[in-house]
Amino acid sequence: MKFLLAIIATAAVLLAGQASASEALAQKSGCLACHGVDKKVLGPAFKDVGAKYKGDKGAEAKLVAKVKAGGSGVWGPMPMPANSPQVKDEDIKSIVHWVLSL
């Protein structure tokens, strides 16, 4: 039982570190200027985005494309600017994966 608890505790620490790294990447990439993790700023809260697309198998590809190209009309009238090429493709994928995990 102690071994199982140790494994669970280790996994929790690793996942928390991964989430912190993803949030730091979102901050560095400028995402948090318009989005909050828990609350709407100019754009939707990341947790709301994750909830909207939960169970959608194509969500990651859709959101990566939306983050790269920008767009409007999905979450209100405020357009989201294109984020490519200034944010690397692999960083966009990492951020989207994190948002969908919230």
Q: What role is predicted for each listed range?
A:
Residues 20-37:
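Sequence/structural segment immediately N-terminal to covalent heme-attachment motifs in c-type
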Residues 1-22, 102:
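N-terminal export/targeting leaders of redox proteins
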Residues 33, 42-53, 66-96:
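Axial heme c-ligation environment in periplasmic c-type cytochrome domains
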Residues 56:
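Acidic, glycine-rich flexible loop segments
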